[in-house]
Amino acid sequence: MPGFSRRPLAVFVCCLFAGVQTGHAAADIERAMVQGESTAPAAERSVAMQLAAVSELPLNLRKERKFDVLGKKKQPAEPVAPMLAPEKPIELKKDDAYPLFIVADQIEGQADELTEAEGDVELRKVGTLIYADRLTYRPLEDEVEATGSVRMLQDGAEISGPHMRMKLADQIGSAEQVTYHIVKEVPSRFYAPQQTVVTVASSNATNSGAPMMLNVSNSYGLPTQLPPPRPSEANGYAERVEFEGENQMTLFSNTYSTCKPGQADWYMKSSETHLDYDRSEGTARNATLWFGGVPIVYTPVAGFPLSTQRRSGILHPHFSASTRSGLDISVPYYLNLAPNYDLTLVPRYMSKRGMQLGADARYVDYFYEGEARFEYLPNDEMLGRSRYGYRFEHRHNLGQGVSAALNWNGVSDDLYWQDLSSRLLQTSQAQLPRQVSLGYSPSPWLQSNLQVLRYQTLQIDPNNPVTRPYFLEPQLNLVGYKPNIWKTDFSMVGQFSRFTHVDAGKVQGDRMVFYPQLSLPIVHPAFQITPKIGLHMTKYTLDQQAAGLPESISRVLPTFSLDSTVILEREGDWFGRGYIQTLEPRLYYVNIPYKDQSQIPLFDSGLSDFNFAQIFSENRYSGYDRINDANQLTAALTTRLLDGETGVERLKAMVGQRYYFKPQRVAITGETTRQNDFSNLVAAVNGLVAPKTYADVAWEYNYRENISERFSAGVRFQPELGKVMSASYRYTRDPLTTLSTVDQVDIAGQWPISANWYAVGRYNYSLRDKRVLESIAGVEYNAGCWAVRLVGQHLGAISGAANDTVFFQLELNDFGSIGSNPIGLLRRSIPGYGKINELPTSSSLLTSQ
């Protein structure tokens, strides 16, 4: 059969149809082929461009042949009515015929047997694009052999070399003397939402807590949203490549790096590397890691990730040094046992204390989830005894409205967290809960819960002993809320509690509470009025009561409240944007008669903090052991700035005060009864005070004595991820001693100091104690495909010597890291901290507020 090159008319028509060498059409078709899109629309759009170019430029006639790969004959298209968009996407099945095009200066061969192309050859198929000097295609085997300057683009990979052979449909073949460049999109694991367990400075805080504004809603315009997936690159050279199917290849005598081509600051050199993109993992044999032209690590077998997906294997070792533990080395081993459960084993060596073993197991299912963590040090060489810590959490949906939960924590001794810097809890809490609960919700308006709750109390500071709380063994709660009952809302609380204590001499006993309430909401677009009545009933059955005190006590108190709010609005302008300002005066009246409660023990009640949440509550005490007598009115004023386009709140300011119409009679131990007819003034402001600047201020002012009882102020400026500065001040005064219990300044930030260099730090100082609670200082360098971090931490101890730690980490992007990882520390200590080698590059990610 004659060769196709002898049919000039067909060749000319094919050239017009292909049109891949003219203008922007060539780039459009190449992008479409690499991304797996159909090239037909692009080719059709380019015809007019090509015809216009013919009159101005000499037309270089080239040959093109089209194949139906699976041998199916192309059916003539039926006329179809024009549509704006298809009702659903067209799906290509595995046995459908994928069209294949070959374009070259010369094409010869036999139909359906052999085609040979030479001279600037281009093969196009959905998802695949091959360039070569010479190419042979066998349609029956669907096999291509290309020689010369071969370049293949397929599924985000670019493979170049002098020779390649491949079966296109199966993606099986080989190539020699290859340079490769692979680009995949991966999501950021660092910026993904996660729960952060933190502490704040309490009334007797002498240690460093979490900084203010650690978690700020992205509605305020700060760049806190999750960035889109970022490109992950891999490139290198291989003497030979075996293509082993879709997303599978093996490189021989190769290099591997995630740096850009020609800028390999680091690379791995190995005798064999297998890349499995289905499992998102790579495996190298006889591998040597080179950095800056110097070999730094050799391993006979190395596994590394190809994405952020989980995989089994040795995680990157962590190294650090501290004054309490000495040289600290841990080598975690991760077991991806199943998609819904995993296990991490963490052997840890501390030069001053010995060998510790840790384990972390996680699991999740449709109806339950949980996590178990355990650490064991068989022999602490500094103390001469074993030490351990554990934490177990489980939540279970048993169906039919039944749920269960377990939260069990424990350590071997009081100073376990302080000495071993454990990662079990990112907090220095002194009360470790041990709780088992069972919940039941028979209907949407009724919930019940049964729990047993105990605590392990840690006495960390001998100068400030921690009071041991009562245990609940057990407690039964019943909560109900039924709206719209003849235009009224019904709510009720029922509770039975059995209080026990480790100190057998303390009073113990049972408490029963039943508190039904009925309210009548009157709602209008401009105002709301809600009167509410209730009857608070409590009964105690006590053990170990002091002589002369009753063992059975009952208390019945009626309650009445009236809550009213008016909402006024106006439009305006703020920082060049339209906004809506609201003005919301609110009055809240409460009346509860007096009843002597001095014979009732204090199981779980205490004086609540005086703030905006508390001044709009009926009872100033927590728990149910004390119900205050009240004839009082709270007056407050709130103003908000709402975005004129979205309605999102940008700024809120509040001020309020409570007025008393009779003297206080109910009090708890240590409380000074009120002598005035009005409370302290409380005020708060939070929100966007300037572009990219968030502020949070709270103030309790005693204007009778002209002093501040409580004050906190913080500001966070963050124009973009990787640039953030924050500063805060916290002060709390003890009303009994008139001395400050908290008086701290806290400054933290991350900021670029030169090209690719970032400074990080935190300074938390106690003005009351005149000592540094925590200081962090360090630098980070982002080289594009690798980053290095050097961070020092000074952590003041509640008792004993302070702990100083140095972190050094070399991170190779999308490959691994060497050294001690300070990321967790920086994230907990610096509000808005951004990982410098995962920062988004598009300014469109940042909001304009």
Swiss-Prot record:
Disulfide bonds: none annotated. It is found in: Cell outer membrane. The keyword Signal applies. GO terms for biological process: Gram-negative-bacterium-type cell outer membrane assembly; lipopolysaccharide transport. Pfam families: LptD. It comes from the Bacteria. One of its GO terms (cellular component) is transporter complex. Residues 1-25 form the signal peptide. Keywords: Cell outer membrane, Membrane, Signal. The keyword Transcription regulation does not apply. Its main location: membrane. Belongs to the LptD family. Component of the lipopolysaccharide transport and assembly complex. Interacts with LptE and LptA. PANTHER family: LPS-ASSEMBLY PROTEIN (PTHR30189), LPS-ASSEMBLY PROTEIN LPTD (PTHR30189:SF1). Together with LptE, is involved in the assembly of lipopolysaccharide (LPS) at the surface of the outer membrane. HAMAP family: LPS_assembly_LptD. This is LPS-assembly protein LptD.
